[in-house]
Structure formats: C-alpha cells, structure tokens
Regions:
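N-terminal Lys/Arg-rich, disordered targeting/topogenic segments
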Residues: 1-3
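Cap/lid segment of the alpha/beta-hydrolase catalytic domain
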Residues: 112-140
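Surface-exposed patches in mature extracellular/periplasmic domains of secreted proteins
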Residues: 111-112, 158-166
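Conserved acidic catalytic loop of the alpha/beta-hydrolase fold
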Residues: 143-162
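Short substrate-entry loop that stabilizes the transition state in hydrolases
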Residues: 71-117, 200-201
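A domain-start/cap signature at the N-terminus of enzymes
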Residues: 6-77, 89-90, 101, 131-134, ...
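Glycine-rich nucleophile elbow surrounding the catalytic serine of serine-hydrolase chemistry
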Residues: 82, 169-178
C-alpha cells in the first residue's frame, strides 16, 4: 500500500481518496430531495421540501406537517424532533391524534442521512462543526434550519407567528437541549428535551458537544 505525506501526516493513498470523496459528498455535491413549490399547508398530513440554508440551495430538507382542521394562527405550533433513526414521519404520525384534539400545528423536520449511525455532528450536535472538525458558520447550523423553516411557514401561509414550541426525543432531545444553549435568540416559547443520550454542560472548559467550550 502506497504511503504519502498529507498535511504532514503519513497516510495511505486510499485513506486520502476516501477523505476527499467524503468531503465532496458531504459538503460540495447537492444533497437532499428536490425542492417543492411554495404553497400553503394542506389540512391534515402534508410535507414540503425547502432549502435548508438561506444562502445556498446545495442542501434541502423535507418537512412533515400536520394541520388540524380547526387550527388557526392563534393556536400553538410544535416542532417535533426525531431520534437517531431520522424517521420524522413516524414521529408526526404518533403526535397527530393529540394535535387534532388540542389544535396544535405539528412540524417535523427530517434531517435525513445515509450515515446516521456513525455521523452525529450534522443533527444532534447541531452541525456547529463539520465531520472533519472545523467550525461551520451559524447560517449552516441545524438549529438555524429550524428558524428558517419557521420563516417559511410564515411566508408561505401568510401567518404572523412569533414563537413556537419544540420537543425532541433521544437524539432529538440532544438537539433541543443544545439548541437552547447555543442559539438563545431562537423564537422558542417552550422546549422539552426527552431521553437525551448525552447533554452539553454549561462548562467552557469542556469542548462542545459535551460542554460549551471550543
């Protein structure tokens, strides 16, 4: 096996090729389903696909929604954050009955990834850092994607909502807890983090994601 010097390190040529291809797949090539036209939400179960970031269309995200028949913009909005399995639609279905009874607009973003079992930085860690360890701009944080989705709900439906609630289970619980810590300007009214496997402690001496240090 051929060994080469790369950034001062002795690594195999195969390792370099894998790293380059991984970088291209994760951060250069377009990812996600095709965007759907902007339109108002349908009553009942629905979904749409939008750009995850405001400054580029490179990454898209599917958003599942459930709008009760009697819901009005004066009622509650609840973001439901899925677990490690990235199965947002299942979480939406589990909440739909109570949402109908309580007049809650459900919003379940789907942070899809083929590598969800080995990559955690993009979702439950908020995408503050890339898989390769460098810091991402706040505009590409997963927490910012939630705010972008909330903006899309307002503009596409002529709503004038100014706050939302958010619940997360398992990996979604990690997401919610870290979002509260790292994005305090988010328009969150109430947040519930359930069954999180790990937490970020308010300790700058501990590097993120287990603390808030760099």
């Amino acid at each position: 096996m051929k060994i080469i010097k790369w950034f001062g390190l002795s690594v195999s040529l195969l390792t370099v090729i894998i790293l380059i291809l991984g970088y291209l797949y994760l951060y250069v090539l377009p990812t996600g389903p095709e965007k759907t036209p902007v339109r108002p939400l349908s009553v009942g179960k629905d979904s749409f696909v939008m750009s995850a970031y405001q400054h580029t269309d490179r990454k898209t995200i599917r958003v599942w929604t459930y709008k009760p028949a009697q819901w009005t913009p004066k009622d509650s909005v609840l973001f439901v954050m899925h677990g490690m399995g990235r199965n947002a639609e299942d979480y939406l279905d589990a909440w739909s009955d109570i949402a109908e009874r309580k007049r809650i607009l459900l919003v379940a973003p789907e942070f899809a990834s083929q590598f969800y079992r080995v990559i955690t930085n993009d979702y439950q860690e908020g995408n503050l850092k890339s898989f390769f360890g460098w810091s991402n701009p706040e505009s590409e944080w997963a927490f910012t994607v939630i705010e972008n989705i909330f903006d899309r709900l307002n503009t596409a439906n002529d709503f004038d909502l100014d706050e939302y609630n958010i619940f997360g289970h398992s990996a979604g619980g990690q997401f919610v807890q870290r979002m509260i810590l790292m994005k305090p300007n988010a328009r969150i009214k109430t947040a519930i983090a359930g069954n999180a496997g790990t937490y970020s402690f308010v300790d700058k001496a501990v590097p993120y994601p287990y603390g808030i240090g760099t």
